[in-house]
Design a protein with these regions (language model features):
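Beta-propeller fold detector
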Residues: 7-12, 63-69, 107-115, 169-177, ...
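Repeated scaffold domains used in trafficking and secretory/extracellular systems
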Residues: 17-32, 71-84, 114-137, 182, ...
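A short helix->beta-strand "capping" segment at the edge of beta-propeller domains
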Residues: 1-22
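Short loop/turn segments that connect beta-strands within beta-propeller blades
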Residues: 57-60, 101-104, 162-165, 230-232, ...
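Acidic, serine/threonine- and glycine-rich low-complexity intrinsically disordered segments
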Residues: 123-133, 137, 141-145, 151-162, ...
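Structural motif
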Residues: 47-54, 94-100, 149-159, 213-227, ...
Length: 332
């Protein structure tokens, strides 16, 4: 198995107290940290009222963009996405706060949900979830939950976004095809959970962490898988699929997060599994695993995103403590 080695470019100490990393992004392709190469991180203030904040990381430091109290929706999470050198935050299914230039004042772009009241794309009971989404264009896959609300995602849709015309609309609302996975549960109608989504070269990827409704931190997952899917949720190809994880009696599970690169980040739930709690990467093209070696003194950091040779890491210890921008030194 190959190994990806990281070296530290810059470490950021946080002046304010934040909860944890909701999702991340990158604003430009770049092999080194330079003017215009910036990383994004969606988090939330610990102190009341707990405002959501986008941290923009560059060689000059951290720019904090606090989202308004109207983003504190009890039902819907904000969703971060990037497009070239700009980014947007989807608010409550209805509009996009679109940040350009110096990000000081966002444009508000409404999202159309069908053209007639009786033909809405998103059902009323759909709830927006923050899980990391990556796209190389203007079609942004977004995670949702409906009917039963655990803060998870079992549904998705596509946001069709036109940054030139300042228009956006929802396209479709689907679940991932359950029966396509070897270890699906016939006893329930629960659709596979969605950890992360990616649209690249007109191909839609989804990572599912199985179907279990119970606490995976307590009981483990039933299975996990990576697949190419259609916008209607049909599984076109499985790139990765685990065994039935509960068959051996040992708790197990792996979460997946797409990046702005060919790699999917795989994060095990438990430290006593076969991976010893260490993250791995999975190449979407080569379909091979890669180990990750963090820079010295940063072994407790977790990897959250990759773009070119840039890697975004963060340290969580009862709150978000530290953020790192690293460079890929090489692959051995």
């Amino acid at each position: 198995m190959s190994t990806l080695k990281l070296s530290l470019i810059q470490k950021y100490k946080l002046e304010n107290a934040y909860t944890y990393v909701y999702s991340t992004g990158f604003l430009s392709e770049g092999s080194i940290l330079k003017q215009g190469a910036r990383a994004l991180l969606l988090t939330r203030r610990e102190e009341a009222p707990g405002a959501y904040t986008v941290l923009v990381l560059s060689e000059t430091g951290i720019q904090e963009i606090e989202l308004g109290e109207d983003f504190l929706d009890r039902e819907n999470d904000p969703v971060l996405f990037s497009y070239r050198d700009s980014f947007g935050v989807i608010k409550a299914k209805k509009e996009i706060a679109y940040f350009t230039g110096d990000f000081s004042s966002p444009e508000i772009i409404p999202i159309k949900n069908g053209f007639l009241p009786f033909s809405k794309v998103l059902p009323e009971n759909a709830r927006e979830r923050y899980f990391q989404t990556v796209s190389d264009g203007c079609l942004i896959p977004v995670c949702f939950e409906k009917e039963v609300y655990y803060g998870l995602s079992r549904c998705f849709t596509i946001l069709d976004f036109n940054p030139v015309k300042k228009e956006a609309k929802w396209k479709g609302f689907s679940e991932i095809e359950k029966n396509a996975f070897t270890h699906h549960d016939n006893r329930t109608k629960d659709a596979p959970k969605i950890d992360s989504l990616k649209m690249a070269n007109d191909v839609l990827y989804a990572y599912t962490s199985g179907e279990s409704t119970g606490s995976v931190n307590k009981w483990g997952m039933d299975y996990y898988a990576l697949a190419k899917i259609s916008p209607e949720g049909k599984v076109k190809e499985k790139l990765l699929e685990s065994e039935q994880l509960k068959a051996g009696g040992k708790k197990s599970g792996v979460n997946g997060t797409f990046t702005h690169s060919d790699y999917l980040i795989l994060t095990p739930l438990f430290n006593n599994d076969d991976w010893k709690g260490k993250q791995k990467l999975f190449s979407l093209n080569k379909r091979e695993y890669t180990d990750v070696i963090m820079p010295r003194g940063m072994t407790k950091h977790s990897l959250h995103n990759i773009c070119g040779e840039l890697c975004l890491t963060a340290l969580y210890d009862r709150g978000l403590k530290e953020i790192g921008l690293c460079k890929i030194e090489g692959i051995e």
